[in-house]
Amino acid sequence: MNKSINNLQDIFLNNARKERIPVTIFLVNGVQLKGIVKGFDSFTVVLDSDGKQQLVYKHAISTVSPAKPILFNNAQVFDN
């Protein structure tokens, strides 16, 4: 069995990054951060907001809301 099954979180963030879709990140404390996803790993997201970079820890994120729908197909989600 192929162990390269992509998870939805990675696909979502990667498409937001590649397409440079503006996102609003809502933190668990209510703070809103707006910007472009520049990169991410298992624990953090790097957000570019007006030329300033912010490293946001995923455990502090409640919601990521894109400015427009992020399109992906089932082939990205499920590796046959």
Swiss-Prot record:
GO biological process: regulation of DNA-templated transcription; regulation of RNA stability; regulation of translation, ncRNA-mediated
Keyword RNA-binding appears in the UniProt entry: yes
Alphabetical keyword list: RNA-binding, Stress response
Residue span(s) of domain Sm: 10-70
GO cellular component: cytosol
Family of the protein in this entry: Belongs to the Hfq family.
NCBIfam families, per database record: Hfq, PRK00395.1
Name listed for the protein in its UniProt record: RNA-binding protein Hfq
Annotated organism of origin: Clostridium perfringens (strain 13 / Type A)
Lineage: Bacteria, Bacillati, Bacillota, Clostridia, Eubacteriales
